[in-house]
């Protein structure tokens, strides 16, 4: 037996969750249920969670419900609730969301998380931020408020001579670089409280950048340090200025500033490193090497105990420099994990490695210290650093509690302020119940809240209690979930008796109708025990007489009323966003327009189901500025799309070879990830042939009449001209011109430069057909005709500004092809020599029929157009679509790029675009498995997304010049206001037909009555009134027709073989039979 | 007595126990599979000692891992031994193989700061299944032809299918490869003609595939015109051909002592060989292109030896028609390699213990249990069985029966993935063997990348590793108890038929008939019932009380029965009123025997259900008065409680089912005292309890 002396009292601590975020953003917390001084047994409940009460899983409320229709607000299972549920917070839930921000590098520098945002200096926007630029704990934030301040440099830093820089630093001069405010702000529609902030001072992948940086700047650094060391240390101003400069230079500032304090052992390490760098002390280097060697060894052991031994040794070595005098949390930088970086050291030179080592220890490890110590301390094993009591001291403090930060603030302040690279900030939002929320009971009786009524308007019980919720009585019979009625009535009894019931399902073991008899007996005892006789009326068991809250009148019939357990369901709204990112462009009749600039007035290229191209106005444009989620990115040689996961792609199964558009379907992107699918790039352009007429001009006071052109010839001519021609006024007759008799008189010259034989051949054919004569000289074809000149002159712009005239869009598909091919002939020869060789070869060997596919490919590759005009490039890709093909725009050469041509260096003055025309392979396949040129990925994304909806549901879009058909935003059409369900087939022209349940009700009411109503009242009422208005409006003589029901009646009677008819009296009172079907 | 009634097993036990099993045996088993790793000269060998593996404590606890966006995992260390036979050195070292994600107490994993659940997958258990296939002969769908197939389902590796097609030809089928005549396949597996035809009761049935080949008319003429011997054979052939229509002929043939069946068959194919050779001579061009033989693709060459069969198999799967004397050997070698790779290599094909057990049982074989790959005997006996099934002597299997379906728990899935990771590691090590210079050290060979990569892949992309549904504790718990037929190795939701989605009699007490999602996943994603458990074999078991002479033996405890064991038992429902002494009521009692409901006297009853809740899932058992609800609505009711948002103030339901407490406690969301004691401190942050512990 143990005596009382041998009893040990051990405290066991249970830490509780406080508003943790769950995967679905609901909150998780613990609510203690025990009181101090209570005795608990093992297994007893200590604390509830967010969805339990007294250890019982409970997620809802027992509320007073009645099954009654209320002004039609119960339509389609909708629910009517009392405002009490809102104001008493009965259905209020807390949702916790996490927002992340991290700094990134752009060409001008690294972003910075700071409160120091110049642009907002004079506003109140920064008031709630702490000095690091992060919203303070507990701050109540609204939409648009800054969560984390961040600035992005937008201008590269100017290189300043080093002495100037030093001068600036010493005098504390700050150079303001251009920055942009890129703060994280509270998204739309959110009003929430900051409940947790986590800062991350380091990022793994950054270490490498650091290395480079250190390497680059080491000279400057050394210089500064040397400078400093030679000066008096008490010069605080200077050290500070130096510090600030370093802050800009490297993130090592934390280090340097620490160094100034001279209390930390780190300083000495650092100093030592620097010395070595400057003077290469051989002795010390050796020592350090020893230390490193030790580290290498020790890192391979995983036993902590062993590590600890090494540690002591290691520290002893370091104490040579300086032992810590005071508590310094930074001391723990020398932690076991540091050694894991061993591999890095090996790669680096000793000098570099030293710096790096110190740096890594700071960056990587300072955060882990707490948790590590904590673990050790709590386990009660040998303390990790037995000789330093502060280890356990730090360890005991909870890592995440702000108090710990508080303690450490002095030492780690600069660390924090300058090193934060990413912040997680948690916002807790209170969501009260509102219209549109989904609620449900436990029997599958779900509905959407349609109206919130003031409690005085709700129907009330005989004792005056207003009901909380009105459910549709039609929701019970057809659904056959009678359990809800039992529950509701037993709830009523339980509420009045103050009892709770736990009933296992399948209680038939206790006799037939066990549930019903139990419920009624409980109701009865509630009546007898409370003395409230209305609770149970034998005539209407389970039903109560309710009173209308608005009038105080009793309802006609007794109503099922009782307490039911109702729950609030999460809403899944993300389903509704199907969009693209802003870098997509949409094809409209006004050219390619960025997605965010499209208006409903634009005509957007859409695709009919039969594959025909039609221009339509978008019906709606969607803009979600704060989308947060994942995007689907598909990139291929021929297509490039970046869309939300539920954006619908216009694809078909990859294996199907047929070119028809029948197999294409709109499938959400998330469902085709990784699948072999084919996209579509072309359309059929159904247009009549266009006839171009050259407008008339006045020449020498003679009107030259309009000229109808031969389209084939004209298109060929025009195509070549727009590519390589110009029109000019030849005012001074120069020698060249005089040489050509025919045109010497005319100053209006249209010229085409000929570089290819083929082009000359074509023009030789074409120009005579058009009725012009031409000269060929010096690789130029010259036509002198004023009419032609007058038309072409305005189009004859400099190369970068060229575009196609509007009539081009009226061309038929074949005509568009002719024009396009004509334009391309100009470039064909040069780029196509390979193909032509192959073609000639194959024709010689008469193998052309053997390799048609091969040849086609060649053609595809060959058809390209080159231009420096952005507009023309866009026009051509549109023309390609009209031609039943498609065009991909590539930026061939950037402005300012240099290429050599014939040994000469040529600098591009403009961007050069290449438009490659795809004729046959317009169904780019993805994931076909032949080769892996394409890219398909799902990326996290935060930012704006856009979309539009068009009647045809499919529109033409391109990203990076690669165009493709894709689905529009939303197709399910309008949503019912009450039930929030898509109307789909139930709506026509905005009207809404009867709901499913209402139809059942009508069936019960009697189809005969309905028929009667429709035939008599409704039909005559509407049509009669319409016709009368018609007559009134158009001032016709009034004529009142026969009621429809009357017609029906006559037809019925005629069907019974009765001789019956409608007769109309003439002016002369002669009766004339009227045919029933022709009656007005 | 009363406590028995309220006994309900822990709800997330399934996940925890499975992970425990993984740590105890699965991990060791998987490591052992890779042991030892040797280089090609066999002078270097790496041997792991998996039994002594150690896990370092995780850096973060599961809660911190979520906050820091880290993975809740621990490092796996295994002692490794490097034997250098050249230098006669043995080195020994602990090596780190990788990070193993740990399951939290609540039964989920934390990967990159997000709680993830690995849901249990129901797959067809490894073994052999016979099934019937119905073909429409004409388009009017009036005349159906019944054909049969046997399917070898492996735990890992390709599924082999022996099937009889519309034309009664027998094939061996594999996914993504053209089908192969079964004779080829059997010969290719290593059987000889003699064994093959002697061990089958109807050897000629196998030759059916070639009968059409023999039909070529001019052969008969040719043969006849040759000499007497040939004419005789031709006659035999004719008779054989007729025999498929009329079996009496063959009987008479059998009876006449000249023609033993085997002889007959031998004759037939020897004739075929001679014919073919001749033909090759006659039409060298045609045979080279293979045109003649492939007029109808179905007509294959006959193979008389394994070598020939392998040649043919390889030419078939690679779709090369030309077999010349030059590439003959190569083809045979490749064919052999192919078959070995697909079915004989323990690294790529694995029946699993249960697969071997079930095969042995079904085919009455006695192969050793360590034989985890397919053998030629398996296929041979399966062929024999298939032919018997065709004759109607044996029945087909019901693939929807739960005895034929197994649950792959989270541990099985992780174990498989670790297997993949270790395979990569092994490959890595092997390649390092070839590049080493001097005296290697153990650490040089090991890297954590292969294993970590494989696990990361699994947790990140596998559809069975899901983002945990944490809306409320019920959602979390049902997520962990979910059973799905989807995912790799399962069915796809587009091709799933109604049969798979439907309820099967064996679901009783194992899979909830109510709780399943609405929509396209209906019936494919299921929920485990409250009392069910998954045994180490992956079969779902449900408890019953033993009934002895009409008395329910409650004190004898639960008898957990799997679907197979339950098949023959007579089971009474759980909601019967018992007498005080535990006897069933007198008179006829409604009982169930597999799929029929009858009434029997109490003395015939074998078992009684434990509770009415036994047949429904956790979420469903939260619905009060469930028996009064239509099943569709009960389904919605069960599903919607999972979507309920925790409220700032919620209430206990006035009407409940009594299982609410268990849900709260088993979900691990509420805190329960680990030991008794005095509450010393309570705040929103922590609770401190002073426990008295006596020192001994």
From Swiss-Prot, chain A:
GO terms for cellular component: chloroplast; DNA-directed RNA polymerase complex; mitochondrion. It is found in: Plastid, Chloroplast. Its main location: plastid. The keyword Nucleotidyltransferase applies. It catalyses: RNA(n) + a ribonucleoside 5'-triphosphate = RNA(n+1) + diphosphate. It comes from the Eukaryota. GO terms for biological process: DNA-templated transcription. Transmembrane segments: none annotated. GO terms for molecular function: DNA binding; DNA-directed RNA polymerase activity; ribonucleoside binding. Its EC number is 2.7.7.6. Pfam families: RNA_pol_Rpb2_6, RNA_pol_Rpb2_7. Keywords: Chloroplast, DNA-directed RNA polymerase, Nucleotidyltransferase, Plastid, Transcription, Transferase. Belongs to the RNA polymerase beta chain family. In plastids the minimal PEP RNA polymerase catalytic core is composed of four subunits: alpha, beta, beta', and beta''. When a (nuclear-encoded) sigma factor is associated with the core the holoenzyme is formed, which can initiate transcription. In S.helveticum the gene for this protein is split in two. DNA-dependent RNA polymerase catalyzes the transcription of DNA into RNA using the four ribonucleoside triphosphates as substrates. PANTHER family: DNA-DIRECTED RNA POLYMERASE I SUBUNIT 2 (PTHR20856). This is DNA-directed RNA polymerase subunit beta C-terminal section.
Swiss-Prot record, chain B:
Pfam families: RNA_pol_Rpb2_2, RNA_pol_Rpb2_3, RNA_pol_Rpb2_45. Signal peptide: none annotated. Its EC number is 2.7.7.6. One of its GO terms (biological process) is DNA-templated transcription. Its main location: plastid. SUPFAM superfamilies: beta and beta-prime subunits of DNA dependent RNA-polymerase (SSF64484). It is an enzyme of class 2 (transferase). It catalyses: RNA(n) + a ribonucleoside 5'-triphosphate = RNA(n+1) + diphosphate. One of its GO terms (molecular function) is DNA-directed RNA polymerase activity. It is found in: Plastid, Chloroplast. InterPro entries: DNA-dir_RNA_pol_bsu_ext_1_sf, DNA-dir_RNA_pol_bsu_external_1, DNA-dir_RNA_pol_su2, RNA_pol_Rpb2_2, RNA_pol_Rpb2_2_sf, RNA_pol_Rpb2_3. Keywords: Chloroplast, DNA-directed RNA polymerase, Nucleotidyltransferase, Plastid, Transcription, Transferase. GO terms for cellular component: chloroplast; DNA-directed RNA polymerase complex; mitochondrion. Belongs to the RNA polymerase beta chain family. PANTHER family: DNA-DIRECTED RNA POLYMERASE I SUBUNIT 2 (PTHR20856). DNA-dependent RNA polymerase catalyzes the transcription of DNA into RNA using the four ribonucleoside triphosphates as substrates. In S.helveticum the gene for this protein is split in two. In plastids the minimal PEP RNA polymerase catalytic core is composed of four subunits: alpha, beta, beta', and beta''. When a (nuclear-encoded) sigma factor is associated with the core the holoenzyme is formed, which can initiate transcription. This is DNA-directed RNA polymerase subunit beta N-terminal section.
């Amino acid at each position: 037996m143990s005596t009382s002396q041998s009893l040990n009292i051990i405290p066991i601590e249970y830490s509780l969750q406080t508003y943790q975020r769950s995967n679905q953003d609901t909150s998780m917390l613990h609510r203690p249920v025990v009181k101090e001084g209570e005795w608990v047994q093992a297994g007893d409940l200590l604390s509830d969670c967010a969805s339990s009460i007294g250890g019982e899983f409970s997620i809802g409320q027992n509320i007073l419900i009645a099954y009654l229709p209320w002004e039609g607000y119960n339509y389609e299972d909708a629910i009517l609730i009392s405002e009490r549920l809102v104001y008493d917070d009965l259905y209020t839930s807390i949702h916790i969301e996490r927002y992340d921000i991290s700094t990134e590098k752009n060409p001008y520098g690294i972003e910075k998380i700071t409160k120091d945002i110049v642009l907002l200096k004079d506003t109140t926007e920064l008031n709630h931020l702490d000095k690091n630029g992060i919203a303070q704990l507990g701050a109540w934030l609204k939409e648009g408020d800054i969560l984390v301040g961040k600035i992005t440099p937008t201008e590269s830093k100017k290189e300043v001579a080093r002495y100037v820089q030093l001068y600036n630093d010493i005098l504390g001069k700050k150079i303001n670089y251009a920055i942009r405010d890129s703060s994280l702000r509270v998204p739309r529609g959110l009003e929430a409280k900051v409940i947790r902030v986590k800062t991350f001072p380091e990022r793994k992948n950054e270490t490498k950048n650091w290395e480079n940086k250190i390497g680059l700047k080491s000279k400057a650094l050394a210089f500064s340090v040397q400078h400093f060391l030679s000066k008096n240390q008490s010069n605080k101003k200077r050290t500070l200025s130096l510090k600030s400069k370093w802050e800009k230079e490297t993130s090592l500032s934390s280090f340097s500033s620490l160094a100034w304090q001279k209390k930390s052992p780190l300083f000495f390490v650092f100093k030592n490193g620097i010395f070595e760098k400057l003077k290469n002390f051989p002795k010390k280097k050796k020592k350090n090497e020893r230390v490193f060697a030790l580290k290498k060894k020790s890192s391979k052991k995983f036993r902590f105990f062993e590590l600890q031994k090494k540690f002591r040794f290691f520290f002893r070595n370091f104490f040579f420099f300086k032992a810590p005098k005071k508590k310094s949390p930074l001391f723990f930088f020398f932690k076991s994990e540091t050694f894991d970086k061993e591999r890095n050291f090996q790669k680096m030179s000793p000098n570099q490695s030293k710096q790096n080592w110190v740096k890594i220890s700071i960056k990587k490890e300072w955060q882990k210290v707490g948790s590590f110590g904590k673990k050790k301390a709590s386990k009660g094993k040998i303390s990790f650093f037995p000789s330093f009591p502060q280890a356990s001291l730090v360890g005991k403090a909870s890592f995440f509690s702000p108090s710990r930060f508080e303690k450490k603030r002095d030492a780690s302040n600069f660390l924090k302020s300058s090193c934060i690279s990413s912040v997680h900030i948690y916002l807790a939002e209170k969501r009260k119940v509102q219209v549109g929320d989904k609620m449900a009971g436990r029997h599958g009786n779900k509905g959407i809240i349609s109206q919130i009524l003031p409690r005085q308007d709700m129907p009330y019980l005989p004792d005056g209690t207003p009901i909380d919720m009105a459910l549709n009585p039609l929701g019970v019979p057809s659904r056959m979930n009678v359990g809800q009625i039992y529950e509701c009535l037993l709830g009523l009894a339980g509420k009045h008796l103050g009892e709770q019931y736990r009933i296992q399902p399948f209680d038939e073991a206790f006799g037939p109708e066990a549930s019903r008899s139990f419920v009624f007996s409980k109701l009865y005892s509630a009546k007898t025990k409370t003395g409230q006789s209305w609770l149970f009326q034998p005539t209407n068991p389970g039903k109560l007489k309710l009173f209308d809250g608005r009038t105080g009148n009793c309802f006609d019939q007794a109503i099922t009323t009782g307490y039911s357990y109702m729950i609030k369901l999460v809403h899944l709204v993300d389903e509704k966003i199907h969009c693209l990112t802003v870098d997509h462009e949409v094809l409209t009749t006004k050219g390619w327009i960025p997605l965010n600039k499209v208006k409903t007035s634009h005509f957007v290229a859409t695709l009919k189901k039969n594959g025909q191209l039609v221009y339509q106005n978008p019906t709606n444009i969607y803009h979600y500025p704060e989308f947060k989620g994942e995007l689907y990115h598909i990139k291929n040689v021929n297509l490039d799309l970046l869309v939300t996961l539920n954006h619908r792609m216009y694809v078909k199964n990859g294996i199907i070879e047929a070119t028809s558009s029948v197999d294409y379907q709109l499938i959400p992107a998330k469902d085709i990830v990784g699948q072999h699918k084919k996209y579509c790039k072309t359309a059929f352009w159904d247009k009549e042939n266009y006839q171009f007429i050259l407008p008339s001009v006045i020449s020498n006071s003679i009107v030259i009449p309009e000229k109808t052109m031969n389209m084939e010839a004209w298109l060929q001519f025009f195509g070549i001209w727009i590519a390589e021609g110009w029109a000019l006024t030849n005012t001074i007759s120069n020698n060249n011109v005089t040489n050509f008799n025919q045109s010497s008189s005319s100053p209006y010259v249209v010229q085409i430069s000929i570089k290819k034989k083929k082009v000359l051949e074509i023009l030789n054919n074409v120009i005579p057909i058009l009725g012009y004569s031409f000269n060929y000289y010096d690789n130029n074809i010259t036509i002198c005709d004023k009419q032609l000149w007058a038309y072409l002159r305005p189009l004859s712009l400099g190369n970068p500004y060229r575009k196609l005239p509007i009539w081009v869009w009226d061309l038929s598909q074949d005509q568009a092809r002719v024009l396009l091919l004509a334009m391309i002939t100009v470039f064909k020869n040069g780029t196509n020599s390979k193909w032509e060789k192959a073609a000639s070869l194959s024709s010689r060997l008469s193998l052309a029929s053997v390799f048609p596919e091969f040849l086609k490919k060649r053609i595809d590759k060959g058809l390209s157009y080159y231009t420096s005009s952005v507009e023309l490039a866009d026009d051509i890709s549109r023309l390609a679509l009209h031609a039943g093909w498609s065009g991909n725009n590539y930026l061939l050469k950037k402005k300012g790029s240099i290429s050599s041509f014939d040994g000469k260096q040529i600098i591009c003055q403009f961007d050069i675009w290449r438009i490659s025309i795809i004729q046959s392979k317009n169904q780019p396949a993805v994931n076909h498995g032949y080769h892996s040129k394409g890219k398909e990925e799902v990326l996290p994304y935060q930012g704006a997304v856009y979309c539009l909806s068009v009647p045809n549901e499919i529109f033409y879009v391109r990203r990076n010049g690669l165009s493709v058909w894709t689905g529009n935003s939303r197709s399910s059409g309008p949503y019912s206001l009450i039930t929030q369900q898509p109307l789909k087939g139930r709506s026509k022209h905005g009207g809404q037909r009867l709901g499913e349940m209402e139809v059942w009700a009508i069936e019960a009411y009697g189809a005969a009555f309905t028929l009667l109503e429709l035939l008599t009242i409704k039909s005559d009422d509407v049509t009669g009134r319409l016709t009368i208005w018609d007559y009134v409006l158009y001032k016709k003589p009034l004529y009142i027709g026969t009621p429809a029901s009357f017609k029906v009646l006559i037809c019925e009677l005629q069907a019974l073989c009765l001789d019956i008819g409608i007769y109309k009296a003439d002016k002369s009172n002669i009766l004339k039979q009227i045919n029933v079907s022709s009656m007005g | 007595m009363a406590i028995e009634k309220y006994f309900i097993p822990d709800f997330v036990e399934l996940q925890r126990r499975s992970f425990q099993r993984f740590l105890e045996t699965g991990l060791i088993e998987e490591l052992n599979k890779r042991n030892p790793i040797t280089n090609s000269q066999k002078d270097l060998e790496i041997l792991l000692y998996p039994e002594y593996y150690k896990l370092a404590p995780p850096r973060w606890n599961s809660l911190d891992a979520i906050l820091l966006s880290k993975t809740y995992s621990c490092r796996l260390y295994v002692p490794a031994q490097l034997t250098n036979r050249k230098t006669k050195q043995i080195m020994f070292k602990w090596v780190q193989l990788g990070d193993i994600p740990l399951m939290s107490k609540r039964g989920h994993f934390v990967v990159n700061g997000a709680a993830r659940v690995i849901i249990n997958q129901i797959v067809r258990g490894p073994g052999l299944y016979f099934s019937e296939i119905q073909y429409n002969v004409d388009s009017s769908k009036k005349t159906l032809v019944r054909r049969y197939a046997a399917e070898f389902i492996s735990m890992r590796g390709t599924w082999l299918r022996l099937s009889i097609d519309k034309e009664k030809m027998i094939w061996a089928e594999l996914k993504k490869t053209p089908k192969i005549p079964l004779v080829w396949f059997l010969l290719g597996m290593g059987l000889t003609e003699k064994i093959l035809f002697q061990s089958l009761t109807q050897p000629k049935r196998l030759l059916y595939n070639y009968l059409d080949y023999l039909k070529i008319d001019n052969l008969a003429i040719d043969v006849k015109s040759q000499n007497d011997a040939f004419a005789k054979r031709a006659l035999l052939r004719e008779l054989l051909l007729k025999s498929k229509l009329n079996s009496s002929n063959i009987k008479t043939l059998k009876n006449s002592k000249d023609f033993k069946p085997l002889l007959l068959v031998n004759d037939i194919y020897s004739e075929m060989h001679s014919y073919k050779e001749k033909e090759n001579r006659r039409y060298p061009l045609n045979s080279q292109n293979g045109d003649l033989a492939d007029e109808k693709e179905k007509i294959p060459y006959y193979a008389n030896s394994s070598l020939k069969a392998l040649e043919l198999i390889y030419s078939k799967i690679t779709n090369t028609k030309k077999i010349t004397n030059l590439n003959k050997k190569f083809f045979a070698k490749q064919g052999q390699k192919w078959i070995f790779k697909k079915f004989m290599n323990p690294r790529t094909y694995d029946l699993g213990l249960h697969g071997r057990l079930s095969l042995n049982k079904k085919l009455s074989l006695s192969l050793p249990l360590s034989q985890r790959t397919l053998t030629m005997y398996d296929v041979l006996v399966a062929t024999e069985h298939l032919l018997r099934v065709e004759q109607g002597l044996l029945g087909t299997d019901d693939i929807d029966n739960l005895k034929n379906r197994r649950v792959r728990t989270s541990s099985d899935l992780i174990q498989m993935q670790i297997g993949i990771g270790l395979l990569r590691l092994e490959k890595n090590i092997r390649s390092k063997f070839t590049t080493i210079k001097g005296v290697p050290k153990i650490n040089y060979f090991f890297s954590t990348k292969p294993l970590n990569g494989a696990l990361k892949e699994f947790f990140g992309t596998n559809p069975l590793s899901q983002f945990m549904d944490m809306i409320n504790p019920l959602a979390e718990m049902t997520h962990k108890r979910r059973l799905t037929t989807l995912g790799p190795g399962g069915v796809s939701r587009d091709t799933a038929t109604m049969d798979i989605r439907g309820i099967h009699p064996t679901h009783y007490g194992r899979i909830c008939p109510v709780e399943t999602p609405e929509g396209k996943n209906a019936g494919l994603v299921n929920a485990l019932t409250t009392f069910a458990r998954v045994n180490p074999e992956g079969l779902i078991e449900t408890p019953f009380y033993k009934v002895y002479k009409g008395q329910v033996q409650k004190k004898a405890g639960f008898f957990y029965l799997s679907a197979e064991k339950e098949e023959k038992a007579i089971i009474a429902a759980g909601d019967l009123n018992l007498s005080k002494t535990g006897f069933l009521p007198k008179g006829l009692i409604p009982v169930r025997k597999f799929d029929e409901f009858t009434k029997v006297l109490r003395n015939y009853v074998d078992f009684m259900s434990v509770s009415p809740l036994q047949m429904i899932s956790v979420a469903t058992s939260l619905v009060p008065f469930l028996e009064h609800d239509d099943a569709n609505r009960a389904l919605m009711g069960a599903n919607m409680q999972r979507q309920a948002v925790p409220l700032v103030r919620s209430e206990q339901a006035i009407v409940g089912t009594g299982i609410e407490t268990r849900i709260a406690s088993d979900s691990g969301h509420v805190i329960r005292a680990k030991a008794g004691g005095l509450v010393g401190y309570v705040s929103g942050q922590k609770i401190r309890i002073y426990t008295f512990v006596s020192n001994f």
